Amino acid sequence: MRFLIILFLIFQSNLVKAFEINGEIIQGALIIGKEQPGKSIYINKQKIKLSKNGIFVFGINYNQTGNVIIESVDKNNQITSKTYKIKKRQYKIQKIDGLHEKMVTPDQKALEIIKKENDLIKNAQLINSDFEFFLSGFSKPIDGVISGVYGSQRILNGKPRSPHLGIDFAAPKGTEVKSPADGYVTLAEKSFYFTGGSIILDHGHGVSTIYAHLDEILVRKDELIKKGQVIGKVGSTGRATGPHLHFGVNWFDAKIDPELIFN
């Protein structure tokens, strides 16, 4: 009997503890997970970074449907798997008039400029650093009124355009924009065609934030930023009808709803 009890206790101590996740599996969500260090984590067969402390993070794109399958693989190739159904959302329609026509239907020369700028933005958002700044949570970059919501279908001068994949804060020109978390500056540009004055901060593991239409940029590329540090000032540069801050969140190329990550 004593042998059986000892054997049972040994078995219990060797049970594989399943990974844990924090967050609702819904379009636009950023999900943080915890697993035993040394394992491998896969999201829908894509291997993602697992920190030395067993932390992982992934995002769900605005239009992603179906399931999220999370697999944890140990050194003996034993797999623990869980499947989650993605909750779909209904998005609003937003009409914006009064834009200069070149900002709605750019000419060929402008399209070439836009492509180069979009490549710079994409490259900055695909960085997979070891930072874990995202773990501290995110505060709002300014206290302005939200004038544009995530996921809304944009109708610009009566013409359907891409969804709005961030949120807009209406605020007076010159309002200070503060970093919502510690970060590393991967892009700081004064005059992009659509986004105007633009900053991208890397928060680690593919999580990044973008700040657009800035009147002033107060940081430099490759600079480490502290949470609450002033990084720029609100403007109306690029494609904008008035002063506001466009704030976006990415997990690599997945667009995350900023309102789901605050605090």
What residues fall within each predicted segment?
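Short, well-structured beta-strand-loop connectors
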Residues: 176-187, 219-234
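Sec-dependent N-terminal signal peptides
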Residues: 3-12, 70
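Short hydrophobic beta/alpha edge segments that flank linear recognition/processing sites
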Residues: 169, 198-199, 226-238
